């Protein structure tokens, strides 16, 4: 923080998806790039791709929006709030100033990641990968890690705390919560002026951002006579399907890219 001369903590300003896109535009200008042929993003990245088409329509030809939503539901906001509370109630969070105290809210951040990771998977994928498999031959009737799924979630949480900052996680979830471009008073003017071609992709087993959420964006674009293609890809991968190998998924993107 240039004003205090100390590391940013909880005093770092809350940012929005629009802020991120604006900063990316500054980087684009500094790199001397005149136009993006494609802006591609999944989940929160998909929201940024959509925002690019709204805020900088003259600088983007095509947007591929994957496993995203035009705004979060109450359920999604609730998941984010539980994750934030897990972090903020960790004593080592230190009011957000843990770096100055030479601490790290690892327990809270690990819990937040465990919760989030559950929402990224589908019930079917978890059943197929873990079921009710035990780590040992018999149930111990105690509170140790007994089921394989428990072990997996703890591993994901422990791994995450070594690669991600807790306050950044808080800011990221808030950016997700606040995203709602349709509520922008300038939305009609923005979407009316964009000439971007859109591809929306959703996945059948994604319950965090289900196909119906992508279809909301598709219907909005159609209502404004925009060029939009849409594919709902069959997958058991849940929300994380957008990160997984899937021939049909790749074919949809490849065809769109080759034709544009």
Which residues fall in each region the model found?
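Short beta-strand/loop motif that positions the catalytic acidic residue
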Residues: 194, 200-202
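Short alpha-helix in the alpha/beta-hydrolase fold that links the catalytic acid
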Residues: 183-187, 210-220
